[in-house]
Amino acid sequence: MASCHKESFDERVARECQEYTAKYCPAEMDENTVLDSLTYDIPQKTLTHAYRLRGSLANDSLYTGAVNLAMEEIVLDDLRESISLRPYKEAGLTFRFVYYSDQSGHKLLEYFFTPKDYGQVPQFQTDSIK
């Protein structure tokens, strides 16, 4: 007799990321931005959005300190306002956003945001979600 395994919250997030990536990625976000994948690191409880920048945004030399800080604020504001990411924010996940150049392949930007950054107090423990 096979045992019944109830999928944990973390397992569900990892599976949903794999399914989303397989079904929708690469996904054009705008003319210069492509979402290449969503992944979830269970031990680190980190949800990663990996993007590829192209066109005028793919230039490595564009990303100076001031541009990096401005982009960080934009990405964080988008995270704070995101309704689709609400269940993951409520669970207190860390979000990683990484951007690569379509031209050089180099990593251009990388941001990590914790509940403290995006202003969310976890409403439940992920281990207890049924």
Where do the PLM segments sit?
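Bacterial signal peptide processing site
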Residues: 4-7
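Alpha-helical transmembrane signal-anchor/signal-peptide segments
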Residues: 10-21
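Post-signal-peptide N-terminal segment of Sec-exported extracytoplasmic proteins
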Residues: 24-54, 112
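Short glycine-rich, low-complexity/disordered patches
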Residues: 30-39, 81-103
